[in-house]
């Protein structure tokens, strides 16, 4: 008589455990969402304002962007024979594309802007196999340098938000901004140091929420974006018109896509190191293809190219949860928020100092992940020492002074004005020079 009772009770117990785990995954996914949300919606806002979009156009642009972030993320999460790297990666608008797209849209028109995005997506899809085979040129001295520079060059973005967002504004650096920003950092650190289990893994989310409530009590939160947003918005093909194509615009966006592929490579290797999963050439190929398809869909639905978000590497590192399940929840939440702009607008009311404090922690974690990879490198070998030091030095310098190449053609500025790209190119070339060519002559 006891055996049937036990067979009935066991499923109930397992169902409860599964429900708890799924709830925790949902909350972790929400943490991933908040980490990338403001950085993502910034891209359509910047481009829309530059091109003088109407309120209706801006509403569509932000909504479809959020929706397509969910689509792009799902493309990467699920490994298929064609696409998907299968790592816990979140995709968002490629911020490197902002200035080129503004230039194309301003000079040629909106439809040419989307034609260039589609062309860049097709290019990424077609060269995915070739680019993936360059994996052998990314040993730890190269990937470590690249991931270090990705993290540390983005830390100033966090400080800018912590100060209030716009350095030229009179309120920038206001003591209230600094108090809220550093309070966010303190809350994240306290939960990470003293909390246990699940509460520790959502330290960033708790820091964002608690600091936002405090900031709201101090009058830093405005719900105007929520009241102005529509309740529902459906994705629509060719909302701004059928894409048109111009050779110079397409070449410009293809160059931008190369820079995003290089940055994505760094993020892929960072996630590989965190999760302990070795990446194959086929993995990388599927990952690049997913980004190519996401860009093509972006052009068709009149939005933008998409790339991996390094913020979420910091979230993953901090939480210690390496599963893809939370990111699936983040992707589905993005789809939902893209359809319900009024709900999605809630995430935009988080004050900039709060986001800045969280960004400093997240980007710092990404940089330290790169340092951990460099720890595996034999620096008693001067070739490795020179490769890392020169590459990181060039990346930091160009990040501080991107105008260094302002007198060069635009095509060169896109490549050489990006510290992450320069670090990657420098590390690959110096590693080949020192560790291969010269080694063969010893």
Q: Which residues does each PLM region occupy?
A:
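Short, non-helical or kinked segments that cap or interrupt transmembrane helices
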Residues: 60, 82-95, 136-145, 199-205, ...
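N-terminal signal-anchor module of multipass membrane proteins
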Residues: 2-89, 96-104
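Juxtamembrane interface elements at the cytosolic ends of transmembrane helices
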Residues: 2-9, 40-44, 48, 184-194, ...
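Hydrophobic, small-residue-rich membrane helices and short re-entrant helix-turn-helix hairpins
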Residues: 194-206, 231-240, 249, 266-289, ...
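Membrane-embedded alpha-helical modules
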Residues: 104-222, 331, 336-441
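Intrinsically disordered, low-complexity non-transmembrane regions of multi-pass membrane transporters
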Residues: 1-28, 223-238, 273-277, 287, ...
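Membrane-embedded helical hairpins/re-entrant loop segments and their flanking transmembrane helices
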Residues: 13, 22, 48-84, 252-324
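Hydrophobic, membrane-embedded alpha-helices of multi-pass small-molecule transporters
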Residues: 23-36, 40, 173-185, 202-203, ...
């Amino acid at each position: 008589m006891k055996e049937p009772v036990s067979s009935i009770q066991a499923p109930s117990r397992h169902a409860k455990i599964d429900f708890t785990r799924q709830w925790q995954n949902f909350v972790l996914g929400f943490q991933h969402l908040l980490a990338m949300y403001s950085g993502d919606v910034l891209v359509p806002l910047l481009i829309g304002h530059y091109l003088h979009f109407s309120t209706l156009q801006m509403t569509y642009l932000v909504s479809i962007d959020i929706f397509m972030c969910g689509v792009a993320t799902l493309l990467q999460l699920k490994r298929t024979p064609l696409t998907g790297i299968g790592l816990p990666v979140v995709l968002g608008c490629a911020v490197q594309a902002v200035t080129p797209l503004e230039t194309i849209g301003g000079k040629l028109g909106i439809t040419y802007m989307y034609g260039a995005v589609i062309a860049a997506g097709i290019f990424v899809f077609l060269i995915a196999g070739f680019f993936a085979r360059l994996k052998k040129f990314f040993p730890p001295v190269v990937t470590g340098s690249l991931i270090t520079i990705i993290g540390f060059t983005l830390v100033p973005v966090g400080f800018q938000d912590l100060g209030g967002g716009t350095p030229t504004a009179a309120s920038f650096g206001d003591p209230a901004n600094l108090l809220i920003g550093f309070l966010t950092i303190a809350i994240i650190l306290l939960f990470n140091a003293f909390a246990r289990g699940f509460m520790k893994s959502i330290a960033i989310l708790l820091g964002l929420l608690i600091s936002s409530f405090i900031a709201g009590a101090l009058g830093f939160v405005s719900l105007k974006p929520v009241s102005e947003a529509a309740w529902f918005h459906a994705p629509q093909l060719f909302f701004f018109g059928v894409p048109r194509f111009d050779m110079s615009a397409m070449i410009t966006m293809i160059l931008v896509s190369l820079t995003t592929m290089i940055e994505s490579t760094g993020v892929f290797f960072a996630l590989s190191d965190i999760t302990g999963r070795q990446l194959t050439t086929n993995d990388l190929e599927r990952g690049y293809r997913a980004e190519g398809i996401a860009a093509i869909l972006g052009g068709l639905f009149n939005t933008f190219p998409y790339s991996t978000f390094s913020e979420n590497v910091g979230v993953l590192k901090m939480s210690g949860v390496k599963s893809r399940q939370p990111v699936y929840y983040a992707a589905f939440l993005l789809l939902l928020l893209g359809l319900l702009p009024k709900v999605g607008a809630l995430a935009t009311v988080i004050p900039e100092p709060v986001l800045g404090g969280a960004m400093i922690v997240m980007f710092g974690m990404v940089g330290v992940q790169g340092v951990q990879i460099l720890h595996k490198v034999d620096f008693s070998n001067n070739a490795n020492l020179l490769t890392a030091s020169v590459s990181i030095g060039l990346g930091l310098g160009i990040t501080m002074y991107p105008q260094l190449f302002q007198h060069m053609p635009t095509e060169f500025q896109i490549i050489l004005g990006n510290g992450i790209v320069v670090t990657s190119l420098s590390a690959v070339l110096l590693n080949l020079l020192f560790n291969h060519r010269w080694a063969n002559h010893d």
